[in-house]
């Protein structure tokens, strides 16, 4: 399996046994100016996250590109 990974945001081969790609998003102190923080990677199972953290998991190659944010205006 290949997934996008941060910080490079380029497709990389996942370690053996990690067949899930994920996109995790959350707000920090700069969220209102910079948008949500994003982490991309591979996992054996879809990661469990805390309240306030978004997670999307998928199981095809390169299915977790960096999210496109709608500009405020």
Curated annotation (Swiss-Prot):
It comes from Dendroaspis viridis (Western green mamba). PROSITE patterns: SNAKE_TOXIN. It comes from the Eukaryota. GO terms for molecular function: acetylcholine receptor inhibitor activity; ion channel regulator activity; toxin activity. This is Alpha-elapitoxin-Dv2a. Expressed by the venom gland. CDD domains: TFP_snake_toxin. It is found in: Secreted. The keyword Glycoprotein does not apply.
